[in-house]
Amino acid sequence: MPDDFKIPRATLKRLPLYYRLVSILKGKGIDRVNSKTISEALQIDSATIRRDFSYFGELGKKGYGYNIDSMLEFFKSELSESDQIKIAIIGIGNLGRALLTYNFSIHDEMTITEAFDIRPDIIGENIGDVVVKHSDDIKTTLESEDIDVVILTTPDNVAQQVADELVKAGVKGILNFTPRRIKTPQDVQVHHIDFGIELQSLLFFMKNYSK
């Protein structure tokens, strides 16, 4: 595809779903898959899948399905799996500690390498082989370690302040678990994860689409 071509945001958000399914199929020794199978596995309608895949180039032929190896190669390049992605997490409360302990154990390409908090009792603690540093060290550490992706699990009343500091440190992506809808410049991507909203959405679909 042309270098200046941009895949739609909605399609990009589905890439990890496609990649995980294709990886599973590859592990089962399957070399081709059609949109119907993908649709049934992911509960995404076939038309959406075909439209998404039309942005991905020549991954298959009509009547033959999509080539698993070609899809894996494409998804790896788009999701930057060829490079080790270093991530920092800020706010080591219950959620932050759980994420740090888990530390993407099934994703070898992503690793939380830095953790920050302000509480004296947790500074210096080793959690999941990562030593917690004081938040005063965020900017210098992120710059020296060339980290531009951060998970934010701070209290919501300081989330925007921390986000502003992250922008100054050159961060380009924030996964925000706080209730605060933080604001950043256009070149800084923020994904908001709100468990309450996700549960409400789940309950809605259970009520209206499970019959």
UniProtKB/Swiss-Prot annotation:
Q: Which residues bind NAD(+)?
A: G91, I92, G93, N94, L95, G96
Q: Locate the transmembrane regions by residue number.
A: none
Q: Name one Pfam family in it.
A: Put_DNA-bind_N
Which GO cellular component terms are attached?
cytoplasm
GO BP annotations of the record are: negative regulation of DNA-templated transcription; response to redox state
Its annotated compartments are: Cytoplasm
GO MF, any single term: DNA binding
What does the record list as coiled-coil region(s)? none
The ranges the UniProt entry gives for DNA binding are 17-56
Enumerate the InterPro entries for this protein.
Answer: CoA-bd, NAD(P)-bd_dom_sf, Rex_DNA-bd_C_dom, Tscrpt_rep_Rex, WH-like_DNA-bd_sf, WH_DNA-bd_sf
Which controlled-vocabulary keywords does the entry list? Cytoplasm, DNA-binding, NAD, Repressor, Transcription, Transcription regulation
The source's superkingdom equals Bacteria
Task: Read off the Gene3D superfamilies from this record.
Answer: NAD(P)-binding Rossmann-like Domain, Winged helix-like DNA-binding domain superfamily/Winged helix DNA-binding domain
Summarizing the function annotation, the protein's role is:
Modulates transcription in response to changes in cellular NADH/NAD(+) redox state.
The record ties this protein, via PANTHER family, to: REDOX-SENSING TRANSCRIPTIONAL REPRESSOR REX, REDOX-SENSING TRANSCRIPTIONAL REPRESSOR REX 1
Mind telling me which HAMAP family this protein's record contains? Rex
The family annotation for this protein states: Belongs to the transcriptional regulatory Rex family.
Q: How does this protein assemble?
A: Homodimer.
Protein name from the UniProt record: Redox-sensing transcriptional repressor Rex
Q: Which organism is it from?
A: Staphylococcus epidermidis (strain ATCC 12228 / FDA PCI 1200)
Q: Gene for this protein?
A: rex
